[in-house]
Structures are given as structure tokens and as C-alpha cells.
């Protein structure tokens, strides 16, 4: 009877080992995906980040990059702990899983909270940022972001082309009589912003506030979904780890 129980325990341990190994392979790939999403958020349209008053969006992306890197290291550690049957490594592995789980939950919550606040933040800050920082010394990133937004999303101004009347740059001599930046033009040539002509200036209502809000919200949905989804999958990893740890403890005795 004792021999039967021992074989049963050993068989269960072997099954758990292979199950946890398979999980760790998938977990490593998931870590790569999480890190890729974080890097994608930072790299793709990174100039737009300079237009945001809050650092929440940036913090969320950095958390994902860090979490993804730690996940990949943890996946390798999990494979070593599983096949070497070292309970101390399994304990460390479980603690790392728990830390990553909390990081991804935090990233998901930050993404959700910022998603709710985004519209208010853009309306309160973007027009003022555009008026006071566009083409001003030390704010080249803002200038580049605004020009890129207007050309890519075919719009002019934060709400409409009239917003540029409040621009400090427009009132300066270096603007050379422009009423809007050249990036507002459908066909961009030097000095085309000197005439607010209906046929060559984008007149889309809603301006780039609406476009930028939609763009960032799409990114936040991806960040929130990836962070929360993989965090939920990690629960299974922690359960498998606890089961294997307990099984090794029983075999030890």
C-alpha cells in the first residue's frame, strides 16, 4: 500500500513538473509579448507623449516593459526550479510570480484610471500647451508632435483652426504672417499657412484633441487587456507551483 502511494505521488510530481515546464515556456513568450507592448507604446508615436500633462501613460508603459523583462527571467528560473526539484528555487519563483502579478494589476488599473481622465486632461491642457509652447525654445518635441498630429490626422488646431489665433508663435515676427502653421495645409509648402484658405487648410471640427484621445485610448485598452489578461494566467502558475512544492515536500518525507 505504501509502495502504491509512493508511486502515485511520484507520478503526480512528474505530471506537475511537465505541466509547470509547459506553462513556463508559454509564460516566457507571454513576457516577451508584455515587453513588446510596453516598447511599442513608448516607441510608436512617442512624440505625442510630450503633449500629455500627466505621466500616467508613460508610467504604465514602463511598468509593462519592466514586468515583461522580469517575466522572461522568471520563466527561465521556473524551468530550472521545476527540473532540479529545488524547493528554495520554487519559493523564489512563486515570490517573483506574485511581484509580477501585482505589477501587471497596477499597470492595468493605471491604464483604466487614465482612460477615464484622458478627455478632461486633454481639454484642459492641450490648447494651452499648443498656444504657449509651439515653436518655442526648449519645446521642440511639442512642435514636432503638433505638426505630426495635424498632418497624420488631417486636422488643424486642438479644436479647429481658430485656436491658432491664441498662439504666441503666430504673433511673433518669425511666423512671417502665418495665420496657421504650415502643417495645417493639405499640401505642405513653405509659407502655405499664411492664408487661411478653405481649400488648402484642414477644417475638421474636433481638431487633434479628438484624434489624439482616440489614439491613446486604443493604446490604453491594449495595455489594460494585456496586463490584466496575463496577470490572470499567472494565478494558474502560482497554483501549479504550490502543488509541486507540496508534492516535493511529501516525497521528502
UniProtKB/Swiss-Prot annotation:
PROSITE patterns: TM4_1. It is found in: Cell membrane. GO terms for molecular function: integrin binding. The chain crosses the membrane at residues 19-39, 58-78, 92-112, 222-242. A lipid is attached at residues 11, 15, 242-243 (S-palmitoyl cysteine). Its main location: membrane. Glycans are attached at residue 159. Keywords: Cell membrane, Glycoprotein, Lipoprotein, Membrane, Palmitate, Transmembrane, Transmembrane helix, Ubl conjugation. Residues 1-18, 79-91, 243-253 are cytoplasmic. Palmitoylated. Palmitoylation by ZDHHC2 regulates CD151 expression, association with other tetraspanin family proteins and function in cell adhesion. Residues 40-57, 113-221 are extracellular. It is a multi-pass membrane protein. Gene3D superfamilies: Tetraspanin. PANTHER family: CD151 ANTIGEN (PTHR19282:SF487), TETRASPANIN (PTHR19282). Structural component of specialized membrane microdomains known as tetraspanin-enriched microdomains (TERMs), which act as platforms for receptor clustering and signaling. Plays a role in various cellular and molecular mechanism through its association with both integrin and non-integrin proteins. These interactions facilitate critical cellular functions, including cell-to-cell communication, wound healing, platelet aggregation, trafficking, cell motility, and angiogenesis. Belongs to the tetraspanin (TM4SF) family. This is CD151 antigen.
Amino acid at each position: 500500500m505504501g509502495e502504491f502511494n509512493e508511486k502515485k505521488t511520484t507520478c503526480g510530481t512528474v505530471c506537475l513538473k511537465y505541466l509547470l515546464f509547459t506553462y513556463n515556456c508559454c509564460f516566457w513568450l507571454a513576457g516577451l509579448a508584455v515587453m513588446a507592448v510596453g516598447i511599442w507604446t513608448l516607441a510608436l508615436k512617442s512624440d505625442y507623449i510630450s503633449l500629455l500633462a500627466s505621466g500616467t501613460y508613460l508610467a504604465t508603459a514602463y511598468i509593462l516593459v519592466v514586468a515583461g523583462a522580469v517575466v522572461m527571467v522568471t520563466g527561465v528560473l521556473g524551468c530550472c526550479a521545476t527540473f532540479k526539484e529545488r524547493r528554495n528555487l520554487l519559493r523564489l519563483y512563486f515570490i517573483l510570480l506574485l511581484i509580477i502579478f501585482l505589477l501587471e494589476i497596477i499597470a492595468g488599473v493605471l491604464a483604466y484610471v487614465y482612460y477615464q481622465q484622458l478627455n478632461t486632461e486633454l481639454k484642459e491642457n492641450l490648447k494651452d500647451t499648443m498656444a504657449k509652447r509651439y515653436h518655442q525654445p526648449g519645446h521642440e518635441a511639442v512642435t514636432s508632435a503638433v505638426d505630426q498630429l495635424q498632418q497624420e490626422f488631417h486636422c488643424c488646431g486642438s479644436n479647429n483652426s481658430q485656436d491658432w489665433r491664441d498662439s504666441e508663435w503666430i504673433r511673433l515676427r518669425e511666423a512671417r504672417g502665418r495665420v496657421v502653421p504650415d502643417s495645417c495645409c493639405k499640401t505642405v509648402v513653405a509659407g502655405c499657412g499664411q492664408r487661411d484658405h478653405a481649400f488648402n487648410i484642414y477644417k475638421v471640427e474636433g481638431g487633434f484633441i479628438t484624434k489624439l484621445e482616440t489614439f491613446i485610448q486604443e493604446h490604453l485598452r491594449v495595455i489594460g487587456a494585456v496586463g490584466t489578461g496575463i496577470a490572470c494566467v499567472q494565478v494558474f502558475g502560482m497554483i501549479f507551483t504550490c502543488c509541486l512544492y507540496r508534492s516535493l515536500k511529501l516525497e521528502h518525507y
